[in-house]
Swiss-Prot record:
Keywords: Repressor, Ribonucleoprotein, Ribosomal protein, RNA-binding, rRNA-binding, Translation regulation, tRNA-binding. One of its GO terms (cellular component) is large ribosomal subunit. This is Large ribosomal subunit protein uL1. It comes from Mycolicibacterium paratuberculosis (strain ATCC BAA-968 / K-10) (Mycobacterium paratuberculosis). InterPro entries: Ribosom_uL1_bac-type, Ribosomal_uL1, Ribosomal_uL1-like, Ribosomal_uL1/biogenesis, Ribosomal_uL1_3-a/b-sand, Ribosomal_uL1_CS. SUPFAM superfamilies: Ribosomal protein L1.
């Protein structure tokens, strides 16, 4: 067995699989069970009671995490003229139009999020098959198709995350790093969960939050009580 697998097993032994932890307890345990010396990413996985094959049960949204993600996202912006200048001033990592599209068609994908002004979307549509599967396609519903590119860049740089239910009815998103204080992780979790709950489709019947786990990138999954979104005071 590798050292990594031994570390993982040791970490997994700290998790009571039959217990449902509060968000704060889960955040603390995620920090303790990170099986890497690097500053691991803390992630949330949620199984939703929806049928993503039906358009009226799609769950997709954005949320600004109060404590950010611990990573400064690289942002690409499709814009020209004054809007391009505003995007650059706001801190966009790469700004362009046809030139940026050609670069992406050539294999360039060194960015974490993409924003476009509405007038650029007809052009951006040419690379939808490249950006879409990677979750990078600008979309009005996530605030990434907008004339206010400066605000969109600032939001993403400041810790805005996007989430979308997959074909198996799962949601995945980041709430920070293992180096974060557990209260900060729990507050990020609470902010994201509040938005997921707000977006519950009216067509969704039965239990909406079926299963929630918190983990670091290489650590074991920690089951969280779906009935609790905010519990910051508990030690």
């Amino acid at each position: 067995m590798s050292k990594r697998s031994k570390a993982y097993r040791a970490a997994a032994e700290k998790v009571d699989r039959d217990n449902l932890y509060t968000p704060l307890q889960a955040a603390k345990l995620a920090k303790e069970t990170s099986s890497t010396k690097q500053d691991a990413t803390v992630e949330v996985a949620i199984r939703l009671g929806v049928d993503p094959r039906k358009a009226d049960q799609m769950v997709r949204g954005t949320v600004n995490l109060p404590h950010g993600t611990g990573k400064t996202a690289r942002v690409a912006v499709f814009a020209v003229g004054e809007k391009a200048e505003q995007a650059q001033a706001a801190g966009a990592d790469i700004v362009g139009s046809d030139d940026l599209i050609e670069k992406i068609q050539g294999g360039f994908l060194d960015f974490d999020a993409a924003i476009a002004t509405p007038d650029q979307m007809a052009k951006v549509g040419r690379i939808a098959r490249v950006l879409g599967p990677r979750g990078l396609m600008p979309n009005p519903k996530t605030g990434t198709v907008t004339p206010d590119v400066a605000k969109a860049v600032a939001d993403i740089k400041g810790g805005k995350i996007n989430f979308r239910v997959d074909k198996q009815a799962n949601l995945h998103f980041v709430i920070g790093k293992a180096s974060f204080d557990e209260k900060a992780l729990a507050e990020n979790y609470g902010a994201a969960l509040d938005e997921v709950l707000r977006l519950k489709p009216s067509a969704s019947k039965g239990r909406y939050l079926k299963k929630i786990t918190v983990s670091t990138t290489t650590g074991p999954g920690i089951p969280v009580d779906p009935s609790i979104t905010r519990n910051f005071a508990e030690a």
